């Protein structure tokens, strides 16, 4: 593709020291994602999928190579600048949603906007519009404990998208849901990635979800292989 990548990594590697030995988890990874592209990463438990996601999201430091997000090399940024870039250009969705239990659905979705110093009235308006878009306009004032598993994951997706990031990373987004609810979340993700032109990078064991992506990559023995 000629369009500039929203995310790329070059010769990415990660290893850990265990006594006198160095254990290589990831080695020589190359990856590019472009606006609106949907990519799944699959692999066995312990293959390094979550480690890779943490490296690509700037939550961990590679042993080798570089990661570029929205045109910025993550390793060249200080911690504060890296945090600002993540809040602006990147959204995260986890298997267990990680919503703040003491806040309502609306307040949870407002949070990234408020961190970015968006005025409260504007933040509430944007968060409300996105919650309505994911089918939760009637649940704005409900706290996570009052929502179903599928509803909580919809709130998490809305929170990830509220800053209109170029990329959303999802770590097993349907892994804790029944098949019917998981299909609804999959359909929602596909619709939003198309309509908002957001790139989605999904780590999953769910091959049904993976097959709906534009590309599927298998993480095996520290390397990414196209399926």
Curated annotation (Swiss-Prot):
Recorded GO CC terms: plasma membrane
Record key words, sorted: ATP-binding, Cell inner membrane, Cell membrane, Membrane, Nucleotide-binding, Translocase, Transport
Protein name per its UniProtKB record: Lipoprotein-releasing system ATP-binding protein LolD
EC number annotated for this UniProt entry: 7.6.2.-
Domain ABC transporter: start-end pairs: 7-227
Entry keyword annotation includes Cell membrane: yes
GO biological process: lipoprotein localization to outer membrane; protein localization to outer membrane
Pfam families the UniProt entry points to: ABC_tran (PF00005)
Organism domain of life: Bacteria
Family per record: Belongs to the ABC transporter superfamily. Lipoprotein translocase (TC 3.A.1.125) family.
């Amino acid at each position: 593709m000629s369009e500039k990548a929203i995310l790329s990594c070059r010769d990415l590697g990660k290893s850990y020291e265990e006594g006198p030995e160095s254990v290589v988890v990831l080695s020589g990874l190359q990856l590019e994602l472009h606006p609106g592209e949907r990519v799944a990463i699959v692999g066995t438990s312990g293959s390094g999928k979550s480690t890779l996601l943490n490296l690509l999201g700037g939550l961990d430091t590679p042993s080798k190579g570089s990661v570029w997000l929205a045109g910025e090399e993550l390793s060249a940024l200080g911690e504060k600048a890296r945090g600002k870039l993540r809040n602006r250009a990147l959204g995260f969705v986890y298997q267990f949603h990680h919503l703040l239990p003491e806040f309502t659905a609306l307040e949870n979705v407002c949070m990234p906007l408020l961190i970015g110093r968006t005025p409260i009235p504007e933040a509430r308006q944007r968060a409300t519009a996105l919650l309505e878009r994911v089918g939760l306009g009637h649940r704005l004032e409900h706290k996570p404990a009052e929502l179903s598993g599928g509803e909580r994951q919809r709130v998490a997706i809305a929170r990830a998208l509220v800053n209109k990031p170029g990329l959303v990373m999802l770590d097993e987004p349907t892994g804790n849901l029944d098949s019917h609810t998981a299909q609804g979340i999959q359909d929602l993700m596909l619709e939003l990635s198309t309509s908002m032109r957001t790139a989605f990078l999904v780590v999953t064991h769910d091959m049904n979800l993976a097959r709906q992506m534009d590309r599927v990559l298998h993480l095996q023995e520290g390397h990414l292989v196209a399926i």
